[in-house]
Amino acid sequence: MWRLKVADGGNDPYIYSMNNFIGRQIWEFDPNAGTPEERAEIERLRHHFTKNRHKGFPSADLLWRVQLLREKNFKQSIPAVKVGDGEEISYEMALDAMRRGAHFLAAIQASDGHWPSETSGPLFYVCPLLICMYIMGFMDKVFSPEHKKEMMRYIYNHQNEDGGWGLHVGGHSNMFCTTFNYISLRLLGEEPDVEAVCKARNWIHDHDGVTSILSWGKTWLSILNVFDWSASNPMPPEYWMLPTWVPIHPSNMMCYTRITYMPMSYLYGKRFQAPLTPLVLQLRDELHTQPYDQINWRKVRHMCATEDLYFPHPFVQDLLWDTLYLLSEPLMTRWPFNKLIRQKALNETMRHIHYEDENSRYITIGCVEKPLCMLACWVEDPNSEYVKKHLARIPDYLWMAEDGMKMQSFGSQSWDAALAMQALLSCNITREIGSVLNSGHDFIKNSQVRNNPPGDYKSMFRYMSKGSWTFSDCDHGWQVSDCTAENLKCCLLLSLLPPDIVGEKMEPERFYDAVNVILNMQSKNGGLPAWEPASSYYWMEWLNPVEFLEDLIIEHQHVECTSSALQAILLFRKQYPGHRRKEINNFINKAVQFLQDIQLPDGSWYGNWGICYTYGTWFALKALSMAGKTYENCEAVRKGANFLRKIQNPEGGFGESYLSCPYKRYIPLDGKRSNLVQTAWGMMGLICAGQADVDPTPIHRAAKLLINSQTEDGDFPQEEITGEFFKNCTLHFAAFREVFPVMALGEYCNKVPLPSKKK
């Protein structure tokens, strides 16, 4: 039986931590764990998911919840609430529903104070890790038979009925993910004549074979030796030797893109390929529709399957690749340039890889980069300590749920904890849940990054991190503006509560450090990006080589990051009015103006990390309301409220399709269904806009849906994925289904006047 362990570094000598592993979450298989009844319950949950898998829903992350609720012996003691047709919601009904949700949310807190949760959804994550383990010879050392069984369960559970796999859970089949999941099954030991494998292979052949896979697919298939490197556009490591004032220098790129192409350029520059094994030769035969040695690799370089293509390459980009391909690469791969320039570039690239690995405790910045950096270290020296340190951190990426084992984007520990704590604080029941708030407060304080990256970090193209919070845990090391802001908000709110209940407040200097990170992130237009200051030219997006994502070459300002930062700075100014007053006032004015400037004509805001217009509009309205903008005095607030009322469903809920993100226009869910997480966002947006003072009916209708949808134990059902990134891919935050409905009900009880049944 699989069990989750938290804040545990194990006995591996090659793993280390900045805060004693607080926030770490890893799954281990114990054949002796669990009673027969517990094992039967897990199998029932697995069977139920598989039976309903074609609904396109992600997992409800039930294995962890079952484990923790049993460990805590949680029993919901507050009776369920149902609002009848035509019945008015009383304060007592809303309070009971809110308390039921808050007590359930409190019960799924881990011993170190965070809320373990799945962060997944894309279906291209695990294949590169498996390719890496296969090439390095660690497949059976890292993954037990139970690992492999659960990975195959996950892959099969998310196979579409046509035999393919989508870019993400619930997405239409494409060549990229169908090929990746086909290869994953074969590497895990599945035979080619298995029915589901045959069905996937038929899908690939029916769509003209694997040669039309997008560029990341071409890269990994070249590494596996199922493609030839001449099928890939150039990724020269010489980029790292350019002067930083050159616009296309990697230092001017968004960090995820920079660190993805860093090891890619190393492997490309080395032209590394896996040895030809019987399995690799079989994959060549199975995936291609013509003999391998007859494929014109140069011809397929610009090919991309229709199903894969979201961001077509502009002509100027293809011209650049063709120039490098025809003129530069033939020189760099021949003497003397391969010794004088290429080798020097490879050494410089490797220096940056080692720096990034060390600074993230070998977690690396994310799951796309992890296998690439690990393989680059192995290619440099297969017996190095770098490789051993990488291997020790693989468990940090693996997550188990009722749909099987998957590779996460990386953990969302700090993000989820900040939101969960604010949800509980919104309920205003501090003494009921004091120990939970105390534990969460400790986790947040222990998760703050206390130092900048080591050495001359600016020369390594890094930004300050001292005082920040990451998206995941402290060891990850990468500052994020909204994660810093949301955790700072928690610490500021908790500092106003009795320390004997919620713990001692954070030292002022640590507040100042967090504020310093946020202030220095603001762009000239008043907005904030996610990871690093935005200073590059927008035209660089024309060079985006990633055909399935958009806006990932440079940092962009986001409504959510700006909103979170503005809220945090407003709270901070209230408690520390003398600190950097002029700078802070200027920051606030610019951020407010930015939010008003980017509002769309229909009154909405485009969200970049959640789906999409509902998410962005709630964030914008929350920040504007905290800045003193109201329905009466601000047209932007009125327009935002009008937009939310317009998209509200007849039963009171909100439901937005992920298709809003790529098409950049509001698209409702099929059948105008409602989604409870999005209902919470829409409801809170209306509350922030002051809708209760105009006409509270839309808020009451949304609250009724939340209350009546609550389960017997106080949880809420899992529905469609509600996260997204880079315009075209969804991201499953399993914690959202509890956090946001509880937060919405907390605000409803404490900000919206309700009649009382008490005489």
Swiss-Prot record:
GO cellular component, one term: lipid droplet
Any one Gene Ontology BP term: triterpenoid biosynthetic process
Gene Ontology MF terms in the entry: beta-amyrin synthase activity
EC number(s) recorded for this UniProt protein: 5.4.99.36
PFTB repeat feature ranges: 148-189, 588-628, 637-678, 699-743
The organism's place on the tree of life at top rank: Eukaryota
Keyword set, alphabetical order: Isomerase, Repeat
InterPro entries on file: SQ_cyclase_C, SQ_cyclase_N, Squalene_cyclase, Terpene_synthase_CS, Terpenoid_cyclase/PrenylTrfase
Substrates-to-products reaction catalysed: (S)-2,3-epoxysqualene = isomultiflorenol
Stretches that traverse the bilayer: none
Catalytic site positions: D482 (proton donor)
Keyword Isomerase tagged: yes
Stored Pfam families: SQHop_cyclase_C, SQHop_cyclase_N
CDD domains: SQCY_1
Protein family according to the UniProt entry: Belongs to the terpene cyclase/mutase family.
NCBIfam families, A to Z: squalene_cyclas (TIGR01787)
Remaining remarks: In cultured cells, IMS1 mRNA expression is high between days 16 and 20 and precedes the accumulation of bryonolic acid.
Summary of the function given for this chain in its UniProt record: Oxidosqualene cyclase involved in the biosynthesis of bryonolic acid. Converts oxidosqualene to isomultiflorenol.
Listed name of the protein: Isomultiflorenol synthase
Organism: Luffa aegyptiaca
